């Protein structure tokens, strides 16, 4: 299902998806593909079935080369007024709240929940099954491996509160370029 006033760039593939109104999908986006889920057995891995959908709510922009996997059982949801920069990957069952901005080359692993008004810097990675609160800012290149509460700014690997990060790395910050 594709809503009203949707812009679809070249080589975009949309399957198993519900697209809201006024959505922009730039070139080479792939939505609704099977996610990366396996059941590991002793001598073999069996692909886990994906029967959920991708839901893109109204007024979302998805830049070039983004991929959004369909949910395994639940849906993968991109909230209203959210912007995904180039080459962002959203894995199965991820839920992104409203008014969020996600910069280029971010990867969000399966079943993570991203709150409203979240900003994620480029090349950050978010591990699976995490909860990122509302009004959170994640610095570029950060590696998020634990939940982040509301109204928090983090950066680094592992991602930590920005004040703690700056205190721990002040020697590095003072180095000449």
Where are the predicted features?
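Structural signal for interior beta-strand "rungs" in well-ordered beta-sheet cores
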Residues: 1-161
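Long, leucine- and charge-enriched amphipathic alpha-helices
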Residues: 160, 166-177
């Amino acid at each position: 299902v594709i809503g009203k006033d949707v812009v679809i760039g070249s080589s975009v593939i949309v399957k198993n998806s519900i697209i809201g109104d006024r959505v922009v999908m730039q070139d080479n986006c792939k939505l609704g593909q099977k996610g990366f889920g396996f059941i590991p057995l002793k001598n073999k891995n069996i692909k886990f079935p994906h029967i959920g959908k991708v839901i893109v709510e109204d007024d979302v922009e998805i830049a070039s080369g983004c991929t959004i996997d369909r949910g395994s059982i639940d849906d993968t949801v991109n909230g209203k007024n959210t912007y995904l920069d180039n080459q962002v990957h959203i894995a199965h069952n991820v839920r992104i709240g409203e008014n969020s901005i996600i910069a280029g080359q971010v990867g969000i692993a399966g079943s993570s929940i991203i709150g409203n008004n979240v900003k994620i810097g480029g090349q950050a990675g978010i591990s699976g099954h995490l909860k990122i609160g509302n009004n959170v800012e994640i610095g570029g290149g950060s590696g998020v491996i634990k939940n982040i509460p509301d109204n928090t700014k983090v950066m680094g690997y592992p991602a930590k509160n920005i004040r703690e990060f700056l205190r721990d790395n002040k020697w590095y910050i003072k180095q000449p370029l």
